[in-house]
Amino acid sequence: MNRRHFLHTAIASAALPSLASAQEVKAKAKKRILLRSSWQTVNIGDIAHTPGMLHLLEKHLPEYEVTLWPSSVDNGVAEMLMKRFPKLKIMETTAEAKKEAFATHDFLLHGSGPGIVGQKSIIEWTEKTGKPYGIGGVTWSGGGTDKGEGVKVISGGKFAFFRDSVSLEMAKAKGATSPIMEFGPDATFACDLVNDEPAAAWLKEVGLEDGKFICCIPKLRNTPYWEIKKGVKFDEKKNARNEEMKEHDIAPLRNAVIAVVQQTSMKVLLCPEDASQMKLNKEMIYDKLPEDVKKKVVWRQDYWLTDFAQSVYNRSAGLFGNEQHSPIMCIGHGIPAIVCRYKEQTSKGFMWKDIGLSEWLFDHDFDEAEKGLTPAVLAIVNDPESAKAKAAKGKAVADDRMKRMMDVLRAELEA
């Protein structure tokens, strides 16, 4: 064999393993993920679950094709998702489209949510396909009256990540036995949707400068869906509970707003997470402020989508209030955020403890916000560098746990 022929043969032989492994990777990459998510569009946090999970998949499993199986992507949400994720396929909610998706996808990933929102979908997937599934970043309160169905669904999954440790312990206590059950934060931490140009223009229009305002969001004990979603009947019991507790729950926010304006140079933005809160902000905070305080408070009168809101939060000094997802969106971008919780919100607020932000968690059921909220808000305003450092630590914990979730998913896809 002459030298040239030897070299050619040797090089070709050496290339074979890499070619083979490349073909194997390509073959594995053909596996498709069906993401069950996008629960509703009247809350920017419920919207944010999906782009957060899509960003994680894009970052950690870029070679896999993803199709979204939504409940709702109306009100401009589909367009917003496609703008950020142009390769995304959104399944039509028809029997034919579902049948095709079931046949052509290999793994069902249930996205983040206030529970196993797509529990019936998981059962249908399992019964019709026998293919694997996993659950990523949910709160779980024990299944309620589902006669053990939730435990079976958790146990049948290849993995189940819970977005707060209380939910994780509940699943264990109820006897759930998925091979991997761990703390895995809400995928909203990974949401990177922004709409900078319109957001910056609006802030200029209302006189808010970057880093010189803090955001505030109120919330009732029960979201009044009868006001913001078609077909939802008025709930007299929930409405009565809202009326009973709204001054108790929102007065600490109002007091913090007044303190910020009177004791610092900061302005305050009263903004919504869901479509009912513009009215709530006006009724319970803005209209009850002293006239001199109102001059440095901006009340946003319109609902907004996740990308616009994120761009505003990113330009703020921080956020506080009775909501959960806007604080998650903030921490995900290194912006300080305080959560005030109560039992009607389920256990999701405890994820603040799980990511090391206990000092920024206040429980209305124990009147913690009444005493501690204003000092905590003022501390963020008066020492922004320390506050941002604390936010960064919380973000790092969330990022690490979300990576773990993606690593587990990859292992299942490549098994």
Give the ranges of each region predicted by the language model:
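Hydrophobic membrane-targeting alpha-helices
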Residues: 18-19
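N-terminal secretory signal peptides and thylakoid transit peptides that target proteins
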Residues: 1-14
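Active-site anion-handling motifs in enzyme catalytic cores
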Residues: 11-14, 23-415
